[in-house]
Amino acid sequence: MMTSWSDRLQNAADVPANMDKHALKKYRREAYHRVFVNRSLAMEKIKCFGFDMDYTLAVYKSPEYESLGFELTVERLVSIGYPQELLNFAYDSTFPTRGLVFDTLYGNLLKVDAYGNLLVCAHGFNFIRGPETREQYPNKFIQRDDTERFYILNTLFNLPETYLLACLVDFFTNCPRYTSCDTGFKDGDLFMSYRSMFQDVRDAVDWVHYKGSLKEKTVENLEKYVVKDGKLPLLLSRMKEVGKVFLATNSDYKYTDKIMTYLFDFPHGPKPGSSHRPWQSYFDLILVDARKPLFFGEGTVLRQVDTKTGKLKIGTYTGPLQHGIVYSGGSSDTICDLLGAKGKDILYIGDHIFGDILKSKKRQGWRTFLVIPELAQELHVWTDKSSLFEELQSLDIFLAELYKHLDSSSNERPDISSIQRRIKKVTHDMDMCYGMMGSLFRSGSRQTLFASQVMRYADLYAASFINLLYYPFSYLFRAAHVLMPHESTVEHTHVDINEMESPLATRNRTSVDFKDTDYKRHQLTRSISEIKPPNLFPLAPQEITHCHDEDDDEEEEEEE
């Protein structure tokens, strides 16, 4: 006879003794199937599942798709007057990573932390460090809010652009035909600033995406450029059984239809043996031309799409939600109205940390799931190169040993130079395992700007949303404790504290002598017996009053 969890938890004192770290690990899914949690989320509270298309439902193959975008953008630049020699460049996926910042003044690609501190600085293909960096960034720091100067390359679509900017800066800096300047380059009497060059690249990228042949070439060879996953119909059909499913993409209907038709092009339906279904049947609401992030604010006029021609019907759509209708434009408020849902009822799944995740979280309160395809490689390095991480920990222990018996009275200065050199070498080797710009999430022990944005705005994240297939829809995604240094480096063992040295350490904040408190209160009230006094002493809460998790609101449960 099996014992229920509620029975097993009656004696809660037994749980910690039996549930050590190794025991916890056996309940976790495989790393490549995991969904990672920043803020707790109860799946049973989710009533609507929303999807972006590009790089979410439709994952583009890397580096094939980035190479195509790179080539088309270079061709566009050459067509408007840039040197023919640029056509010799080919996309190198080992150089760029997402989340880099381009300095339009000096032409540098920067990797920074959440506060704007420099982690990596590259001028073209030349990595700058030390005194050279301080000439342009005296405090090794940038003002991230100076958006006129600093542009964050945060999306997967930015990867070809990131590498192209490095190619251009390196070419114009080193080509003998041009004279390199601090803020640009000269060709005779002609001066081109890095700001102007950057704007040309931005315009070329937009042209390739909206007027060029990128989408046409993608559709011509879908097998080459788009990942097709047989588990997609199964997951969406299961989602539709427990809630509503919608698609909100910035792409137009014609392109969306071709991509989605390919993604669901299987001889069977959700399961082998079931009949094939058109892709539209997996969604309760389909919305194209969303124009995110504007979509999460005032939005645009809601129109209806003629699915036979791909053109928009005249007039604003004002009717109820109808199955089979494809909408264009609108806003996140429109989605909520049509689906009869409110902010926290919706889990929105996308890859764009600004256009999908940040805006849906800040403006609408939607729950958020960030798709980070690079996470697969990050996890591979984290596990496959564990020896490097372990060596860093050993070096930290060795460093601590050298100082173990020294205090402020010591004149001895241990020689730690060799340890420092080794730490730098191991950290560099670790960084290079990810690529030339290092990890998407860190540089050594310091987290990147991108990592901080993921932690701040994404409730859940994973390499693919398909990982939701491995969790029940009743699952409670619980966030792990985010430990501060004094918590992560101090063991849970009793430490005798000298009260004279640390008087606040033994200050009693948990237990109160209520008899003594009542006596004092009685003494006070006797002296002012004719006045009913206010509460003179706070009482410790006897019920749970603190909010510990994002998704543990008992008031909402009581209302339901």
Curated annotation (Swiss-Prot):
Stretches the record annotates as Required for tetramer assembly: 548-560
Residues at the active site: D52, D54
| Hydrolase found in the keyword field | yes
Segments of skewed composition (Acidic residues): 550-560
Q: Where is this region: Disordered?
A: 541-560
Q: Which residues bind ATP?
A: R144, N154, Q453, R456
Activity regulation (record text): Allosterically activated by various compounds including ATP, 2,3-BPG/2,3-Bisphosphoglyceric acid and Ap4A/P1,P4-bis(5'-adenosyl) tetraphosphate. Binding of an allosteric activator is a prerequisiste to magnesium and substrate binding. Inhibited by inorganic phosphate.
User: InterPro entries given for it?
Assistant: HAD-like_sf, HAD-SF_hydro_IG_5-nucl, HAD_sf, Pur_nucleotidase
Source species, domain of life: Eukaryota
Q: What does the entry give for GO biological process?
A: adenosine metabolic process; allantoin metabolic process; amide catabolic process; dGMP catabolic process; dGMP metabolic process; GMP catabolic process; GMP catabolic process to guanine; GMP metabolic process
Gene Ontology CC terms, in alphabetical order: cytoplasm; cytosol
Which residues are recorded as modified (Phosphoserine)?
S418, S502, S511, S527
Q: Which UniProt keywords apply?
A: Allosteric enzyme, ATP-binding, Cytoplasm, Hydrolase, Magnesium, Metal-binding, Nucleotide metabolism, Nucleotide-binding, Phosphoprotein, Transferase
The residues that the entry says bind IMP are D52, D54, R202, D206, K215, T249, N250, S251, K292
Q: Might you give the EC number(s) for this enzyme?
A: 3.1.3.5, 3.1.3.99, 2.7.1.77
**Cofactor(s) this protein cannot do without:** Mg(2+)
Q: Name one GO molecular function term.
A: identical protein binding
Concerning PANTHER family, the annotation shows: 5'-NUCLEOTIDASE DOMAIN-CONTAINING, CYTOSOLIC PURINE 5'-NUCLEOTIDASE
Q: What does the annotation say about its assembly with partners?
A: Homotetramer.
The protein's job, in short, is: Broad specificity cytosolic 5'-nucleotidase that catalyzes the dephosphorylation of 6-hydroxypurine nucleoside 5'-monophosphates. In addition, possesses a phosphotransferase activity by which it can transfer a phosphate from a donor nucleoside monophosphate to an acceptor nucleoside, preferably inosine, deoxyinosine and guanosine. Has the highest activities for IMP and GMP followed by dIMP, dGMP and XMP. Could also catalyze the transfer of phosphates from pyrimidine monophosphates but with lower efficiency.
Q: Which family does it belong to?
A: Belongs to the 5'(3')-deoxyribonucleotidase family.
- The protein in question is named Cytosolic purine 5'-nucleotidase
Q: Which organism is it from?
A: Rattus norvegicus
Source taxonomy lineage?
Eukaryota, Metazoa, Chordata, Craniata, Vertebrata
